[in-house]
């Protein structure tokens, strides 16, 4: 499909939610302009002209006449919330990201819902509050149980994988480097647990995600590691 309107993508590499949108943009091969928002000195123009409702990233503007990113056209559509944007892109570029079979689409959306509740809560608990690793591992095992024997979450790469990929990549990054509020060494122990045969299917799933060109184009391992190493929200006391 020929893209009919401009897309400006407001983002920051720290955010797994922004990463979702970035992967989706690459998957559908959209023509877009990425604008990094300084999250340490949040620009006022963003709060008033791009996302006055939640004042969060990611966001996109779509359509309207050409305009500077800091002063988007009033005619441009402004969209926020990562999965809203991902679904919009799937609509804008039909045949990509969204399964055509209604059952598989329902399964994909269920996968997203489970990830955004169960895995996300365990992610926050372990890395930001230092709760036991067992909950995170249990939730990852639950996600693994929903995977087919081969391929992605519902077979072909879809919105389900777009939702999961940024968090799975960061989970592995943080565990391997023992970053988080949990006791020293607990991250590496959990990382080693994930290398055991019990989690072989999940590890293959993550490897397949990381091998996609959309992931490689949207993820800078060294930069993301540096950002999270210096994130005060997950520093140990």
Language model features with spans:
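Acidic, serine/threonine- and proline-rich low-complexity regulatory tracts
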Residues: 201, 205-214, 224, 229, ...
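Short, flexible loop/turn segments with low-complexity composition
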Residues: 102, 217-226
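Residues embedded in well-ordered beta-strands within globular domains across many folds
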Residues: 58-61, 163, 219
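Eukaryotic N-terminal low-complexity, Ser/Thr- and Lys/Arg-rich leader segments
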Residues: 1-7, 217, 230-237
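GST-like fold's C-terminal all-alpha helical module
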Residues: 103, 110-211
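Active-site-flanking alpha-helical
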Residues: 90, 167-168, 219
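GST-like domain detector, emphasizing the conserved glutathione-binding G-site
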Residues: 1-144, 148-149
């Amino acid at each position: 499909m020929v893209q009919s309107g401009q897309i400006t993508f407001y983002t920051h590499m720290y955010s797994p939610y922004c990463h979702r949108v970035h992967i989706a943009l690459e998957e559908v091969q959209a023509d877009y302009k990425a604008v990094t928002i300084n999250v340490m000195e949040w620009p006022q123009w963003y709060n008033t002209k791009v996302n006055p409702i939640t004042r969060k990233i990611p966001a996109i503007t779509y359509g309207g006449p050409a305009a500077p990113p800091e002063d988007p056209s009033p005619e441009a559509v402004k969209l926020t919330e990562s999965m809203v944007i991902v679904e919009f892109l799937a609509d804008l570029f039909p045949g990509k990201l969204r399964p055509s079979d209604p059952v598989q689409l329902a399964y994909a959306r269920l996968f997203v819902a489970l990830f955004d509740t169960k895995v996300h809560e365990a992610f926050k608990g372990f890395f930001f509050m230092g709760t036991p690793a067992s909950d995170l591992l249990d939730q990852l095992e639950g996600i693994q149980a929903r995977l087919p024997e081969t391929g992605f979450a519902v077979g072909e790469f879809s919105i389900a994988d777009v939702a999961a990929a940024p968090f799975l990549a960061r989970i592995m990054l943080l565990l391997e480097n023992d970053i988080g509020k949990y006791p020293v060494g607990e991250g590496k122990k959990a990382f080693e647990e994930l290398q055991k045969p019990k989690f072989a299917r999940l590890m293959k799933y993550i490897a397949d995600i990381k091998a996609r060109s959309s992931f490689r184009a949207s993820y800078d391992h060294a930069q993301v590691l540096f950002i999270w190493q210096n994130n005060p929200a997950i520093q140990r006391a």
